[in-house]
Amino acid sequence: MLVFLILLPFLLLVIFGAYLLVCLFVRQNNLLLKKTKQLYNNLKLSNFNCVISPFQLLRNEKQALEQSIKVLKQFQIKFDNEINSAFEQLTVYSKPNNIYRFIWFNRNIKLLNKNLQHLYTKQQEYINLTKNAIVYFNNSYDCLVFYRQAFCFLNQFINNFLIEKYDSLFYLNVLNRISLLFKEIENCIQAKDVEKQIAFLNKLHNILSQTIITANRQYMFDIKLSYLTHHFKVLIQKVKQMELMKNKVINSQDLLKLHELINNITIKLKDCTNFLNNLNLMLCERNMDEVQEAISWLFQAVSSKEKSINLVVENIDDFRNQIQQYEKKNELLKTTIKAIELVFQNETDVHDLIIELNENCDLITKNINNLNHQSLAQNQINYEKLFYLMSQTNQALEKLKNSLTDLLNLAVNKFDDYRFFVYTLDDFRFKFFQIENLISDQDLKVPAKTLQVINKSKLELDNIFTEANNNYLGTFNLFSEKIDLLQIQLTEVICDVVSLVNLRLMCKQAFLFANKYRQKSSHIDRSLEQLTKLYNRQNYPDTLEGLINLLTKIKTNTKQDYLELN
């Protein structure tokens, strides 16, 4: 009994250890079983038919890829058999009692897992082999979607702008043909018939592009047609305005001529209307070359008639108001021209422009008198001559305006040249005057060469100023040539004078500093006396050089005596 009690804990420990070992093996077997079931489910859910079908449909002939498809089908049969066998084995291994057959279960479940892994690897290899077929299938549909989008835009454009106005049967036939081509291409994609698919795609591309070009050109001509129609309405309205305004614009005694003009315009408008009707027919027949030529002719005809009608309905009262404004400003214009002529009486180009202006003024005055004579004639008015005089007067006024603008611009430019001449001349004279005052005020001893340059430049400037009163143009040209030389001379004189002033100023500053040490040494005092004499003789370069040498010696002696230089 005592021995049993002693061995009891040991027995319990052994039993507990065996229980833990059994639980560990059971847990490991459950994990292997779960992993194998997951792999089985993934393989079971994968459909190998979707891999074989595109590859099988891609062939153009039934026997072309027969051997390859045979291999794929053999693998599919093997794949299905393996999956079914795995299901049967998993059913056996999933029984509760079998999981406790540790060695047998572990060996068989690992073998099944290995077989399924090998099956999965083989399946991925075949999927990679047939991947290009699937990619081709998807890209074909992407291309088809692109053309469908273009077709939708074209269909919408035709329905909105063209199909109701023009040959709807033509566009309906084209749209139906394109729809049938889409169906054919879809069938080729499904059947993987590459050659037919490419042929249908090329045909679709050509028809679609030609239809887009045709619709676009037809729409543009439709816009031009609307534009021309609008111009015709404006022309017809202007004809009606002519009839309403005949009592004001055209004398009643010339009514027969007015009606003749209106009838001629009306006939031409009717011809243009008939031409527009033919243009609609040409647009419907899509003869773009003839349409372009017809529209070009029509536009020229409309422009020509518009000018004619504008001439007929010209507002004579407004024209008279313009003439009155001109007559009011004519005296001021003449005064201005005389003032410019007086200022520039020796200028040939100004004189020629003034002659041209006077000729235009005389022509305008003559035309105004003729216009007044035509307007006062109550019995008979020659409107052809009246319109001709109005046109001539307008041209003369425009020419007068341009000539006057040219004259004013020329005068302004010459005034600018004159101001430049006077300002530059006075500026040179004033600067030389300032330099002379500076020399006098500072009592500078300037070199004879510098004084000679100053006197020569002043004399030359005075001569130019005097000569300008007699021959301004020649003097201006001469002065323009000498500006650079005068500027160089002025710069040299300024440099000479300023350098003297600066030297004297530096000498003064050096004397102020050196005088502080005059009592330190008799040598310093004697040196300063000599330098002062040089300074009084205005020998500033030698004075400054001597002062610099003296200050250098003072600085050296101060350092040797250990004195602090102030």
Swiss-Prot record:
Keyword Transmembrane helix: yes
Subcellular compartments: Membrane
TM regions (residue ranges): 2-22
Origin: domain of life: Bacteria
One term under GO cellular component: septin ring
UniProtKB keywords: Membrane, Transmembrane, Transmembrane helix
Principal location listed in the UniProt entry: membrane
Record's bilayer topology term: Single-pass membrane protein
GO BP: septin ring assembly
Protein name, as recorded: Uncharacterized protein MG397
